């Protein structure tokens, strides 16, 4: 049995200039962030792992215009051992992005069951259990706005067999 905790706090301040439509434009970015990682092993057969990151960016490109972006990213994983040969993992991911112009929430769930013998390993992965098909997010930099679009594979079952030599 055990518990591990890791905490990081961050702050950055950046001033710069960028050429925008033929004019030198000043900008500034303030970023505040916190990251927390928890690992718990309440009993020998169970491992709990939780990671969370929260970041807030303030980006000013023009004297009177400030964009505020928030990012929350979480991952939770539960690992269970059934004896010495069977292992089961469940992984849940959540991402939340919000700004003055948009909000995106993404929730993903995967699972894996694995049996390990002396000469062979058999695994079954279940991916995208919640059926998420596509999502997009916006990342603001000091000089540009980048839009990311993601298309995910549909729910899938993958069976793997590995031989140990």
Regions found by a protein language model. Give the residues of each.
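Exposed, low-structure sequence patches enriched in small/polar residues
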Residues: 1-165
């Amino acid at each position: 049995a055990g518990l591990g905790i890791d905490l990081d706090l961050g702050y950055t301040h950046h001033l710069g200039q960028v050429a925008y439509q033929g004019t030198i434009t000043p900008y500034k970015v303030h970023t505040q962030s916190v990251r927390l990682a928890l690992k718990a092993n309440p009993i020998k057969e169970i491992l709990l792992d939780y990671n969370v990151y929260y970041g807030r960016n303030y980006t000013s490109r023009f004297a009177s215009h400030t964009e505020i972006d928030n990012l929350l990213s979480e991952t939770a994983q539960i690992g269970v051992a059934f004896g010495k040969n069977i292992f089961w993992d469940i992984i849940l991911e959540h991402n939340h992005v919000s700004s003055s112009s948009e909000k995106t929430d993404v929730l993903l769930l995967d699972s894996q069951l694995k049996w390990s013998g002396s000469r062979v390993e058999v695994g079954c992965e279940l991916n995208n259990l919640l059926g998420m098909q596509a999502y997009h997010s916006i990342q603001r930099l000091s000089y540009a706005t980048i839009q990311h679009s993601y298309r995910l594979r549909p729910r899938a079952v993958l069976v793997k067999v590995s031989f140990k030599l």
